[in-house]
Amino acid sequence: MNFVRRKFRGKLCAYCSTAKSKTDDHIFAGKFFLEKDRCNLPKVPCCRPCNGKKAELEHYLISVLGFGGRHEQAVENLLTGIPRRLEKNIKLQRKLMASMEPAWLRQGSGLYQPTSVIDFDGSKLEALLKYIGRGLAWHHWGVYLRPEDCVSVAIPIDLGSAVLQSFINPRNFPVRVTNDLGNGTVIYEGMQATEPATLTVWRIVMYGGVVLSSNQTPAGRDAQTSSQWWVFTGPPELGATIDRLKR
């Protein structure tokens, strides 16, 4: 561990690209995973302020996202990891339990499955995904995204994800990477343009596709669910183009 920390110390922080790193940081926090699946998770150099801000987001999301797990280790994580975390955060535990309601989730076959829903702060997920997009760009391609560069998150409905993927021309993003961490705990696909190198697209699926939905769905209508999350990065002048791609 000391060797790894020394390896990154003194480099620019992969998240802010301005401060010098003081440590290394898992792009996807180790506690998202079962202990047996925490080996060889991707790391980046990280400064203390970014490490602290990112850890605050992770503390909430590690405790909440597991409730929607659909991957192979979902039950084990729900029974072992989450209770320990919520015991240390009684306020969050009470808030989640108070918001829990029965619901029906429509499957791909058209059948409805009984489940439960809880309140979720999506702004924390969006903030963490911005860190993740920056971290993955550095980890795979050595790209530092400047503070002024565009880093944008999209959490479209599942139909929108399919349409979005069809619009991304492989010829414009010839550099590709895919990874499966922790036997399906985190699966991501990355795409990078030849020029500029900061133009990247990331598709991320966690916990087998945690299903998120809006609480603004009209009564009597099926909720529009989202299980794939996207991060777009690029120079500031491409911000408008990235926004159009998200739509």
Question: Over which residues does each language-model region extend?
Answer:
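Short, charged surface segments at domain edges that flank catalytic/cofactor-binding sites
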Residues: 1-12, 127-133
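Short, charged/polar micro-motifs that form catalytic or ligand-binding hotspots
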Residues: 3-6, 37-40, 118, 122
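Histidine-centered nuclease catalytic patch
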Residues: 12-43, 54, 59-60
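Zinc-coordinating Cys/His ligand positions in small cysteine/histidine-rich zinc-finger domains
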Residues: 47
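Residues that form generic nucleotide/phosphate-binding pockets
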Residues: 64-67, 85, 89, 95, ...
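Short flanking/linker segments adjacent to small metal-binding domains or redox-active Cys/His motifs
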Residues: 83-122
